[in-house]
Structures are given as structure tokens and as C-alpha cells.
Amino acid sequence: MGSNLPAQPNLRVTIIAADGLYKRDVFRFPDPFAVATVGGEQTHTTSVIKKTLNPYWNEMFDLRVNEDSILAIQIFDQKKFKKKDQGFLGVINVRIGDVIDLQMGGDEMLTRDLKKSNDNLVVHGKLIINLSTNLSTPIPNQANGLHRSHAQSSTSSGLVPQVSSASHPSVSPGQAEPSAAASNVSLHPQRVPSTTRPTSTVGPVNGGPAPPPNGPQGSRTNLSSFEDSQGRLPAGWERREDNLGRTYYVDHNTRTTTWTRPSSNYNEQTQRTQREANMQLERRAHQSRMLPEDRTGANSPNLQESPQPQPQQAHTPPAGGSASAVSMMATGATTAGTGELPPGWEQRTTPEGRPYFVDHNTRTTTWVDPRRQQYIRMYGHNANGGNTTIQQQPVSQLGPLPSGWEMRLTNTARVYFVDHNTKTTTWDDPRLPSSLDQGVPQYKRDFRRKLIYFRSQPALRIMSGQCHVKVRRNNIFEDSYAEIMRQSASDLKKRLMIKFDGEDGLDYGGLSREFFFLLSHEMFNPFYCLFEYSAHDNYTLQINPHSGVNPEHLNYFKFIGRVVGLAIFHRRFLDSFFIGAFYKMMLRKKVSLQDMEGVDEDLHRNLAWTLENDIEGIIELTFSVDDEKFGERTTIDLKPGGRDIPVTNENKGEYVELVTEWKIVKRVEEQFNAFMSGFNELIPADLVNVFDERELELLIGGIADIDVDDWKKHTDYRGYQEQDEVIQNFWKIVRTWDAEQKSRLLQFTTGTSRIPVNGFKDLQGSDGPRRFTIEKSGDPIALPKSHTCFNRLDLPPYKTHDVLEHKLSIAVEETLGFGQE
């Protein structure tokens, strides 16, 4: 046939792309390349596209053909090219005369289904090619393409060069240049070398729902990052992909990112207005967050002091009038005293004119008028099924305080008690039945007691003096870095006084709350490459393993650790939430396979499959993993000599543990240690370890006020209908629960207590928008189960309201860890 071929090439073949290739390996995507052959004499090979089922080559080859020539294009996986099946992924065979007239000339675009070979391996997907008789334009320089003989293709497959699937465009420094108040190193991605993959830099910050991830992909188009299939992006915008292949958009004008493509009629003012509206919603939600200790509203933005009693500032509450029981329960105040003092009591006045009372019976003094009535709040269920009961009892009839105890008032006239024996304070009167009685769920008793113990420790006491931090709102990250890193840890433990440049206002709590709210939005912004959004959704965070793109990244992680510690120390909340494994790492707990769900849901599923099935002869693995940074791919041994140790049924448990440890901990160990070094300067490790990982999330982020109506409105049902008795009982129970119980239910079912800024309608799962779902599943004697990656609750058909509440409470309150399945 070769003698009938023309002397010069007469057909240009462009191998454009393949789509939907078969994934043979449980744990890895293939590294596809294509081999084009005519008559066994002319062979051309494309470049290798790493880790994708949808490779895009767009590479051209000129061939000598006649109408009877058969063009065969085979696709192989480079990883398996030396194995028996050569990593075969499919083939197409095209008779040239059937698709194009070589005499008349022409240009034909073909999309053909991939076919099996003789060994009958499973194949699916399509191949897109172009045939053209126009050879007048030279083939562009294909630096990555290989033109080799058939012998070279079959014997030197290991030499196929590794190709970065995408390149990072240079960014004009003027597009996102900050003022570097903290250091001379820019925080922004324009310093990234031009070879950096966009998947290793940033992820979305806010905006609309995420498109479903398609897995790691190679470059699918030769479009620049400033345009896409719909045309050029507005000025200052850039298109990128995260590490899961999800497309997002970077607005260099405002240093923000979003999942939503900017419209062609993009208006910066409209976008700014929308961002400000969202910020206000988030601010209100953030300021309403609280902890069990602060139920009385001590964390309200309107108060001028933190809930920690400040005895030296206490004063006598206003006399006269009375309040309702509900009001008194909310404030902890007492009614005004009238009539004569009880026997043995005397009223005196300090040199400053402040009245106090002497109890000659016990030889003690107090600021509290013994004639006043105190409303005592006790937890537990009353006869009507309520959550609290109110008792009214004269203080004078309670008898003396236990030895070493003292009663005091806050500056808002709320009674609290000092235990000088343990140097702790509490709102609970030690003479009364404890509000932490046996009727309270175990988790609530433990969390409140832990909080009281934690905040009473000497290391958590505010030191004398003030710590002044002055920042500009529009430069809060850099200014905060400079201010907080220049001060010693002991200075940061003084009373925090925040000052916003150009604004009047004294910090009695409101400014510091605003400071931590704004700073948490900025420093956790994936735009800076320090953190990225998890595989679970687009609002929980994890450390970016490629943060080294910023040479100063370890200093910034230490700074962020200080900020988190500073917020806990001064009883403020951050508007940021991390994956469950991050909290476990903070507590120095060992991570488990369940924690992998929030990091890499596909890998979690594959590792779980490996543990549950026989892998002999099915999966070929070694104790090593492939890692890719900035286009450079390396093999990392999970144990000494791991790349030469095969994984078997006997050692697969160890393999899963080592992969989990590497994926979650080892990849970011350097950054995490820097974070913890800053955190532990303010919060000692032995103190924070009293909490579990779910409690630590609440300690850092607070407890949200959850709108049950909005939650119910955006819930789907499988096997149930909204009118079913079980569903009606479920929502009745949720409505009776307090904010802490609701937050724990949210943690149990979604993996985090965070609610999207626009409510439950924007709830995200591992594969994009995912509404909260209740599925009819399980035996009525079993506990409910959750699937946090899919925001799903498996709820058995319990017969009665009481059984449902009991089972749900046990599942929510006693389950440890984030991975419920």
C-alpha cells in the first residue's frame, strides 16, 4: 500500500480531544495520550495529559494517504503502557475515502465512539478529530508533541515527557496590588511563576453554587484564562479551575472570587452593592452567634462589656419597679428590695456613697439587697414539656454561701458568684440545685462545664493594661498582620482596643467584633493562596497545600494562628469554619478515614471500597502516592521504600491509614505547625484539649441562630412526604430545641454548623448545590444516620414523638467526630 501513497503529505490530521474515557484505576485518573497510525508505517504520538478522563490535545500531524488508507487512532494510559494491555482506552479506525475526497479537497470534523480492541476490555467515550487537505499553513510549534517511529512508541513509552495540563497566565501587577504594610512580600497571586497551575492557587470565596466537579482534568481549550466559551471576560476578571476541576472566576478589581461567571453587561457598581448587601447579612448572622454560657445575651452587640464579670466595675442596679419572670430569667437581675431588712442584716455605705449589706449572722458582706427576690433559672423539662422552669425565692432564705464563695454584680446588675477556692466564677448560685443537673443532656453539661473551667484558668485571664490595634478597613489584612505580629504574646493578652483609621468610636466590644468579622473574611480568602475551600462544599476551609507559592506563607500562618487564639482569648468569634479534620489536628487527635470525606470525597469512597473488598489481582498499588506541585510531579513513599512494596489484602489497612495521614496531615504539616505556634502563644495546648472537635468549632465560630422555617422550606424528602407523622414530629422536635442543639443537629447532618449567607437554599454538598434531605431508611430500633457529604439524614419510621426525640437526641448528642458513616 505504501507504493500507492503520494511522495508528500496530503492530509492534515488534528487530534483535538477525547471525552468520557473509562476509568480503570480505582484511585487514579489515567494519563491519556493518542497514537495515530497509517498503514503501520507512519506513526505520530500526542503529548500526555495528566490525570483526566477528558484530555484536550489539539495537535496536528501531516500524513501521506490515499482514499483506501486506514487511519487508526488509539488512546493509551501512559501509567500502564508497559503492562500487558498497555493501558488501552479505546481506538477508532477511519477509512479516508469514506469521509473526505482527497481530489476535491475539504475539511471534515469527526466525532467517533471509541471501540474495543481484540482483548475485549471495557471502553467508552468519544474521540474528536479534524481532517483537512489544506496544508498551506505550517503546523504550530508543538513542543509537547512527539513524532516517533512505531518502534520508539512501543519500546520507549516511559520517555513520554510529562506535560503540565495548563499554565498560569501572568497577571499585571496593577490588577491586584495591595499596599504591603506588613512586609515587602505581596500577598497576591501575580507573583506566581508563569508555569504555575491554577488548580494549586485559589478557590472561590463567595457567590453562587458550585458546578459539580468533573475530577482533575487537563486543559480542555486553548482559550486564554481571560476568556471562555462564551467570549471574553470583563476587564479585570480571570477564569481558573480549583483542585477538583471546578471553574471559578477571579475579580482582580476587588480581590474576590466567585463560582458565577460575570455577565457580559457586568456593572461594577451593581456587583459592589450586592456584595455589601451580602456582607450585611453575614455581619448580622455573625453578631448573633453565641455560646451556652452567653444565653442571656451577654454577647449582644449592644452590650459594652464581655460576659466575663468585671467586679471592679460593678455598681448597684437601679432600685424600684419589678420585671416579668421571663425578663428576669433573661437578665439574671433581681427585684427591688422593700420593707425591713431580715433579722441580723444591716445596710451600710462606702466612702463613695455606695450602699452594701452586712449579714451579722454569717459575718459576711454583699452588694445585693437581701430583700430583693431573685428569679432562678433551672434547666430540665417541666410538666408541660418546656425546657426551663422558673422559681421565685427570697435570697435571704437561701442561707449563707458555702465557704470561700462570694456573690457579686456585673455592671449590668447581673448576679454572679466567685469561688475563691478554685478562683473561678459562675452564674449559678451554689446554694441552689445546679442548672447542670441530670436532666440536661450530657453534651450540654460537659460543654458548659468545660467553658467555665477553660475560661477560669490563669492563662486565660486578661492582663492589666491595653493592647491597641489600629487598622484601615480597606487594608485590614496587611495592617492587622503588621500590628499583631509586632506585639508580644503577653501584650496581646491585655484588654484589646480596636481603632479603625478615620473613625471615631471607643471599643467596648462592638469594634472588636467588627474587626474579627472583617479580618476572618479577608485572611481566609482563597485569593491569598493560604486556604482553599474543601471538597465538601464551598464554605468550609482547609489549608492550601500549595501555599508555598507565597514565600512568606509560614509567617502568615503563624499570624492566622495568633488571630484565632486572640479571638478565643478575648471571647470573640470568627466568621470562618474549617473541615472537621482541621479541628482534630488542632486537638492533636489522630485523623481517620471518615475525615477524608471533606478533603477528597472520591478518594474517601475508593479507600473505603479497598477496605471492604478483595483487591488481589484487581488493583495494583504500592505504598506510595503521586503529588503534583506547579506542574512538577513527584512520587512520595508512604513508608521507607514504599514504591517497591505492593499493597495486599493483608496490609491494605496500613496503606489506607498512611494515605489518609499523608493527604490530610503530612501535605500541610509545615503550614499547620506554623499556625499552631501562633495559636499556642495565646491558648495553651493542654487547655484547649478539654474540648472535642465539634465543641472547638463552636468555641471558634459560636452558635448560630437557626431559622427552622427556612430550613424546613428548603428540605427534600425521600420515602416520606411532608405531611407524614414522622416528618411532622421531626420539625416539632427541632423547634423545641435551643440554638445549641440545633447547631449540633446541623453539624451531625451537614458536617458544619455554618449556614450559607442566603440561608438553607444555598446549602452545598460535595458535588455542588445539595438541599437538606430526610430519607426513609433504617430499622425503627436503630439510630438515625447522616451522610454529611450529601446533607442527608437517614431517619427510620419511628412510631411516636417521644421515641423519635430520644433516638435523634442520642444520635446528635453522643456521636463523636464528623464522619458519621
UniProtKB/Swiss-Prot annotation:
Residues 151-173, 181-201, 217-228, 255-272, 297-306 have a biased composition (Polar residues). It comes from Aspergillus niger (strain ATCC MYA-4892 / CBS 513.88 / FGSC A1513). GO terms for molecular function: phosphatidylinositol binding; ubiquitin binding; ubiquitin-protein transferase activity; ubiquitin-ubiquitin ligase activity. Residues 1-112 form the C2 domain. Keywords: Cytoplasm, Repeat, Transferase, Ubl conjugation pathway. The active site is at C789. It is found in: Cytoplasm. Residues 311-339 have a biased composition (Low complexity). InterPro entries: C2_dom, C2_domain_sf, E3_ub_ligase_SMURF1, E3_ubiq-protein_ligase, HECT_dom, Hect_E3_ubiquitin_ligase, WW_dom, WW_dom_sf. The keyword Secreted does not apply. This is Probable E3 ubiquitin-protein ligase hulA. Belongs to the RSP5/NEDD4 family. Interacts with creD. Gene3D superfamilies: 2.20.70.10, C2 domain (2.60.40.150), Hect, E3 ligase catalytic domain (3.30.2410.10), Hect, E3 ligase catalytic domains (3.90.1750.10). Residues 231-264, 339-372, 399-432 form the WW domain. Its EC number is 2.3.2.26.
